């Protein structure tokens, strides 16, 4: 933000999308530092909006509330072998996983919003309330 906001301010437009996790909205035991960091991102976005929205800069806070079906997230958590095994048996469209392509579509949509109806906070999650590992 420190580098980008002056550039966008000079241009008179721009979008800053900030990603965080479930911990930005609600805490969980043994995750004190993580919750503080994610909550800080949320407050940073609200503060940046207060300062820069009138200057044509859109800031949105995106909470990715669930496990993304990607090797660099789910794969690291489970290990490569188990990750591949689950993808083969459960499939890409399993209810409890968020597809990276769907996240990308949401980010693109936010970047294209008209300033008369900007979204400043979005919560992304799979339509299933029960994660696949709890079913």
Q: Predicted segments — roles?
A:
Residues 5, 49, 108-111:
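Generic structural signal for well-ordered alpha-helical scaffold segments
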